Amino acid sequence: MADTLSKLGISSPAIRKSAPGIDFKPFYTQHTDSVLQFMMLHSDNFFAEQLLLMAGREITGKLADRTTIDSLMKKDHKDLPDHPRWVDGSGLSRNNLISPHAFVALLNKMKKEFGWKRVSSILVNGGEGGTLKDYYSDYPENIFAKTGTLNGQATLSGYLITKKGRMLTFSFLVNNHQAPAGAVKSAVKNTLSKIIDHY
């Protein structure tokens, strides 16, 4: 809003105080995991942005995505390899730069800190629906992951359980491809299917 007003030649300092006698407090209506499940299943980028702001209020006391990201990168994610660059909550910006190595490290950290039961209940599995449904419906108990797609980019990161019971963490990031997105996703599926079936 301030940017829009500034373009119109209107400037005024922000007034940051409540009306007398009014104390604003958060009102929580949903459990975190149920919100995360919805966001992951439907790839809801708006939810992702709002959750980052809500996390910011808890972590820094501000509804500021940049401040929140900076705080998380300096504390919680300071040990991630390859120095990721993270700029938004939804992952839609091409300025986000994170390696498969960093994604795998983050996924392993999540599993260790939150436990497999919780993490697997939030991520979409191959038979559940969402963006995995068309490619992994024949592996409903073997793939727990999240896709990401932009023009010329296709990603899939998560966990797989092989038919021999091994759990592996993986991350595919295919950048600047010229092929149809479906062909890229099929190639990734072929690789993961071989790992599930034979390892």
Predicted regions and their residues:
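A small/polar active-site loop signature that marks catalytic segments
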Residues: 1-117
